[in-house]
Amino acid sequence: MMSVVERVWSEPETRMVLEGVEWETFVALSDQRRGSVPRMSYDNGVLEMMSPKREHENIGCLIGRMIETYSEVKNIEIISVASVTVKRSDLSKAFEADESYYVRNADRLLPKKELDFSIDPAPDLVVEVEMTSSAINKMQLFAAMGVLEVWRHDGHRLQMAELVDGVYQPMPSSLQLPGLTAAQVDEVLSQRNTTGETKLIQDFRARISF
């Protein structure tokens, strides 16, 4: 029987958690939405729906712009898939990150118009802004789905982690985007409330263009 077990309303995020949700119900709810809000995560009967607010979205979008700027400057091919629903019925798991990218697998997946995660890999790099506690352990969820690298921001600082033998290990810089460090990203984000976004990205581009 499906039941609401938690509701969290906060400044950066609103979350609702349901338990006892069948896979087919989750898929139907996901397909009936307009757009990608609320963002959904599903893990063996537990469904979490999260609606981000301004600060959450601003952090996620800025990180995404830095990833795209860095890949352009360093000539690294990527495929952006934003908050695509990554779902595996065989695992009874699904997630929608703030930003998602193929890097290592970009060339392989370039010709594909649609993704089938029963045969296609999960995104190589996902960005997860989590300013309030999730009812689902996202790192375990990402690991089970085979995400190679996770950038996680808690509203204060960024942590980068790589998947090693099924467990995420912290690292100071990205493997998918070599040379880009968490400290560089945090430096830009620390100025987001005092400097306009265009200026931030222009300055970031100038610093990495050498």
Q: Each PLM stretch: what is its role?
A:
Residues M1-F210:
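Gly/Pro/Ser/Thr-rich low-complexity, intrinsically disordered segments predominantly at protein N-termini
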